Amino acid sequence: MADAAPFVRWVGGSQKSLPALLARLPADVADRRYVDPFLGGGALFWALRPQRALLSDACAPLMAAWRALALDPVGLLRELGVLQALRSTRSLPEWYRLVTGLLDEDGTDAERGARLIAVNRSCFNGLWRVNGSGRFNAALDPASGGRDLVREDLLRGCAVVLAGADLDVQARSWEATIEAAGAGDFIYADPPYDDEDDGPPTLLGGPLAVQGHRYTAQAWTRGDLVRLADALARAADRGAHVLSTNNPTAFAGEVFASRGFTVEVETVTRSVSRDASTRGAVDELYATRRSS
């Protein structure tokens, strides 16, 4: 059986940042509940394999995949097998249009999760992107036709890890997730990143340039970054240990530093991005605040 690891590729994924993240964890992280309001592929979760976790993301199909993997892995594997068999009966573009058209349809977690995984395995560079109406609109990778959608060993390995943990897995807002955290928790927040191209760093700045790529229908703004830092600071005041990441812009650094966070910058590697210029070695901001 393959070892557990991220089962989807996600923009901004933390896999290549793990050494920098692990170096900034609290010494008692194994004793704390793990809280992640921007879960994505969950690279840090898979590295830590916490026994207790509160996991959330605004992308509902993604969270359906996580829940299915935790609660109905057999059903998830079955549905992925159905989609893989269907792919062999259609042209690849026709199959892709069919499956992406089902992403917003109702269904069981296994059905919705399988659609998400199949599309993630088939879209260009694993790039989850939606339009202003919230509908998925990333392009098909024409070289994806031979990829295994099921990856049974990997998914079964992930399911074993999830089955052994006390998990709360929901599609909920980051605000609600952080508000539920406090004493004894460790929060890892990896939100959409700030961008210097936004112009003057005002608290009411418009949508971030990075949100030319949308993860959800609601664009992320600098006002959201301020609200996030405030929410994380309040959680630290309640006793949580907080670690957040971002681009090392002057604005992001000031937002976190002014709220009592220790701000550091380190070079990491990223391989999934809408912008090819941001793949490879990039500087990343790490903001930590220990529990009060």
Spans of features found by a protein language model:
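Class I S-adenosyl-L-methionine
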Residues: A257, F261-S292
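Conserved Class I SAM-dependent methyltransferase catalytic core
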Residues: D224-T269
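Conserved S-adenosyl-L-methionine
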Residues: A30-R87
